[in-house]
């Protein structure tokens, strides 16, 4: 009750990243077992995002408590200075900054009480002997939109997921999300998700 003690378990050494290496190395041709692991994982994501956020003191999140316009602009400027400028592509800097500000406003326009994992990738998911997923490494976690983690997971470049597999996993996530919170229409959900896919791609 004093919050000074906790139970710790050994999850072993099998990560989801290692468990689906065959499909990744085959250029995105995942077998049925690997797809089932991905489905099981993506259906567990809303559990930590919604149920895990209940009662959480956001002020304990480090380095900041909430996904906001400043954090979006920080990442977008990283893209500008580390990719655009070194590439020597010609662009109008003031117009780009204006677009960045509008984009940041769009991304943060819907307020939610969900936990944004921030680094939700296969390397940060461990599997127990029964192939149940356990999520590790919460550094950078904060209050924020649930679309972010879904985009992070399904559009990580190294995974090589096919468009069909992505669509199937988005549908699985959407279905699982209904168990934890009221969900927007499919059209609205997909539209919002596309914004975060673009944002994660720029990162």
Residue spans of the language-model regions?
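Active-site acidic catalytic loop and adjacent metal/ATP-binding pocket
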Residues: 48-49, 102-148, 160-161
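Active-site activation/catalytic loop segments of kinase-like enzymes and analogous catalytic loops
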Residues: 77-86, 146-182, 198-203
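An alpha-helical support segment within catalytic cores of ATP-dependent transferases
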Residues: 53-65, 70-71, 75-115, 181
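All-alpha amphipathic helical-bundle segments outside canonical DNA-binding/catalytic cores
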Residues: 64-67, 184-197
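Amphipathic, non-membrane alpha-helical segments in soluble helical-bundle scaffolds
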Residues: 35, 69, 140, 163, ...
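ATP-binding pocket architecture of kinase catalytic cores
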Residues: 1-73
